[in-house]
Amino acid sequence: MKHLSIFFVFFCCICVMLCDAYGDCKKNSDCKAGECCVNTPPFARSTCQKYLQQGEFCAHMGKYNPLGKYINMCPCGKGLKCQLKDVSGPLALFRSRMLTCV
């Protein structure tokens, strides 16, 4: 029982350190410049993440939820748009998955 208690305390300390390292947030204004507040299911934990840069994969699901946070990822950075990448050949079958920040 003593070992289990020590393990539990150690585990809790690790969890607290990891939460602090990722910069939890409640809204975008809690984050640094160039970052947004993102809710990442299934853990329903919100962390500050960087806005996406040119050429990075993006998704239209990077929209606000009712709590004023982004879901899964930040949108493209300032002046960029999430657009379908122009592809041809066999990869054209996967066009819906070829969204990038341009």
UniProtKB/Swiss-Prot annotation:
InterPro entries: Atracotoxin (IPR020202). Expressed by the venom gland. Keywords: Neurotoxin, Secreted, Signal, Toxin. It comes from the Eukaryota. One of its GO terms (cellular component) is extracellular region. It is found in: Secreted. This is U3-aranetoxin-Ce1a.
